[in-house]
Amino acid sequence: VWATWCGPCIIEYPEFVKMQRMYGDRDFEFVSISADKLEQKDKALSMLKKKSSAVRNYIFSGKDSYALIEAMDPAWNGALPYTMLIEPEGKVAYKLQGSIKPLELRKMIAEHPKLGRYY
């Protein structure tokens, strides 16, 4: 989960695009959710184009951002960026509030038995 007004989100976003390119042929898909207000969708779309994002992107269209937070993770306090790795069956394998460490995350994906390996 990211937003155009979140500096760390903008900085780390290209890393996710890179990871999708690296692991896209495996059972891995990067999906982004913008926490920008729906009225700001053009700004969010512009940022995605600048970052060459060719992944599935959503913008939260609800009025209550707390509903998004509760749906994603009741333990999340709403600070951005927020990253989750979810296994194909829906189990959360990793979650982080704050900026990722790209190499650590890539290693975790590559070594995870359900995310980064070929069978």
State where each predicted segment sits:
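Short alpha-helical
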Residues: G7, L38-E39, I100
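Extracytoplasmic/secreted envelope proteins and their assembly/folding machinery
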Residues: Y13-Q20, S32, K41-L45, I69, ...
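Short, internal strand/loop/helix patches
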Residues: L45-L80
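Thiol-based oxidoreductase modules, predominantly thioredoxin-like and allied folds used
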Residues: D27-K41, S53-K63
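Sec-exported extracytoplasmic/periplasmic mature domains
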Residues: I11, K18-D25, K49-K50, R56, ...
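Conserved redox-active cysteine motifs that mediate thiol-disulfide chemistry
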Residues: V1-K18
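Short pre-active-site segment immediately N-terminal to redox-active cysteine/selenocysteine motifs
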Residues: V1-W5, K37, A79
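Thiol-/selenol-based redox modules, centered on thioredoxin-like
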Residues: A79-Y119
